């Protein structure tokens, strides 16, 4: 989960993307109601990619990982690449229908880039 704090605008990301978002404890940070009860491991991350998520995937004994989320062109691609770097033999899949990018074009570009890096992207 993208997790930022009140000092977000003072961070490198905040200086380059000066839009306060996902401030911990706010409605914009919480999962939608439909996902609140979903069981599974959640990772709070204050950067685009999560090394903790990559380590968990690499050490978890999984036969594949599926990613979904926002933004395809920032966080989803970053986490797909972290997992591929930390667990190169672990198949990673991104469901394009369960993601969205900043723009339709950047969404598509990110999906194409992930596909080039051997991430499964059904329908692309």
PLM segments and residue spans:
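Von Willebrand factor
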Residues: 1-7
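Active-site-adjacent betaalpha module
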Residues: 7, 11-124
């Amino acid at each position: 989960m993208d997790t930022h704090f009140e000092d977000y605008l003072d961070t490198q990301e905040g200086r380059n993307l000066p839009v306060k978002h996902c401030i911990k404890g706010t409605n914009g940070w919480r999962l939608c109601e439909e996902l609140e009860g979903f069981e599974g491991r959640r990772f709070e991350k204050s950067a685009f990619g999560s090394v903790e998520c990559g380590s968990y995937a690499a050490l978890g004994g999984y036969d594949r990982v599926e990613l979904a989320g926002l933004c395809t062109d920032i966080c989803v691609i970053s986490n797909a690449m972290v997992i591929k770097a930390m667990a190169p033999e672990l198949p990673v899949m991104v469901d394009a229908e369960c993601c969205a990018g900043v723009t339709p074009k950047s969404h598509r570009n990110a999906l194409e880039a992930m596909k080039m890096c051997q991430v499964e992207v059904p329908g692309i």
